[in-house]
UniProtKB/Swiss-Prot annotation:
The gene is tyrS1. It comes from Pseudoalteromonas translucida (strain TAC 125). GO terms for cellular component: cytosol. Keywords: Aminoacyl-tRNA synthetase, ATP-binding, Cytoplasm, Ligase, Nucleotide-binding, Protein biosynthesis, RNA-binding. A motif ('HIGH' region) lies at residues 40-49. This is Tyrosine--tRNA ligase 1.
Amino acid sequence: MTTQLLEDITHRGLVSQVSDLAQLEQLLATSQVVYCGFDPTAGSLHIGHLVPLLMLKRFNDAGHKAVALIGGATGLIGDPSFKATERSLNSKETVQGWVADLSSQVESVMNPHLSEPIQLKNNADWFSGIEVLDFFRDVGKHFSINNMINRESVKQRLQRPDQGLSFTEFSYTLLQSYDFAKLNSELGCSVQIGGNDQWGNIVSGIDLTRRLNKQTVYGLTLPLITKSDGTKFGKTEGGAIWLDPKKTSPYRFYQFWLNCDDADVYNFLRFYTFLSVKEIEAIEANDITSQQKPQAQGILAEQLTRFVHGEQGLASAQRITQLLFNGQVQTLTLAELEQLEQDGLAVHAISDAKINIAELLVKSELASSKRTARELINANAIKINGEAITDEHAQLDFPLFDRFWVMQRGKKQFRLIKLA
């Protein structure tokens, strides 16, 4: 089973570095404890965190125990690895709130898919009880400044004439290294996974665990997910795609994956789903030979929306998508309209419903001028709440739930008009 796991994640392109592949294969022949750390830098995780979360499930499916470490202490410092500038320090109260949010989120997203609940740890629980002199004596003595400043993740920052590296950030690797040693002694944790920017910290943790606990532990890093053009994947012009439905609605989340480029989608199926590599290859082959629209994006969007938001969130996202593009928006529920208001459609607020529709088309930027607006209306290219507008002098009427109108130009351009 373990050999199959390592072969599978390697075949998927999910392995960047491994501390000792041969020894790790032997170790994973029996059930192990595997952890990944997440520092609280916001009140929600985003899709950049999905690959390590999904990797924890892959290990769990292979018979291992999954641990998520929420960095209540390290989040107060900020990891400088490959960062161009120093992070802004957040207050303890803010970080504590984020720790609670992330802990709840990890459980709600992961537990429905695991054979046993994920175990959560907060490194503030042990760092808050350590005296600074004890930490320097017992942990700091095992770290060489020479090695630390020669690490590539630090060297890039030191070479920037406009940016230094504070002692606060420089000490981060000691904290993360101690996490590994602590989880090893407390839970028997033997494997740490993380992004490839964490390699230096993971290796330091392996070394510290050997020195403090006389135990051999292992690390595995995942590659930075990039698009086919080489750019970093995961953010849009509107910002991050969050896992919290209050920050990114299930509809917006679903649409993000549905709009993946053809050049990227098959790799993303390998990275983000549990479909076998053979199944993904079959989907790709069918899309290439079929004269129909590719199926891969729909499969990716369905798999991930179900994983993060459950069957109800997926059903809602699919229903909104279907109703919008079938022109049946009058049957949208209030909750679905509120998803569209949150981030699904561009919103134009009005204070009075007695407004000429041609004028509204211009104000909402669906038409460049009143003349264009009239031409669109006369060409039957404008719909409001699914009904075609044929009178250029018409005014708004019959709002959905007393305050919403969905205005549509052609097949793909929408505005949500809201009575403020």
